[in-house]
């Protein structure tokens, strides 16, 4: 299988996430084709360049792609390419599915850590790094239908679903 990766190489956070993704993909025997964008004006052409070459598109949390969600989703959906973004907001914008960071939960975790510091219960240098437990998949059923994809019931029963 081949997966397309779309990102703004000028965003250090995006490039970092892509490197991690490429290593994970290689470990699973998945080929990665990259397409980079520097503005929302590049998104349509980048998706088109990957069309017919990839089984799906993955992209990290990226400001350019977030700003161009509607363009990205339309281009990929028109080409019948499943999209898996790193941010759940893009699912609401028309991308297919993700398992992403829950920013509300992350904020609560950070707030608890900050309170512990302010109350003198912990010192930042002594605190363990915290991560979220795995989240539920978030799936846009309207997008699945638009690209001709049927999501298996065993996945749907454990997912949060958007139907618009």
Model-inferred region functions:
Residues 1-164:
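Short hydrophobic alpha-helices and adjacent helix-cap/hinge residues
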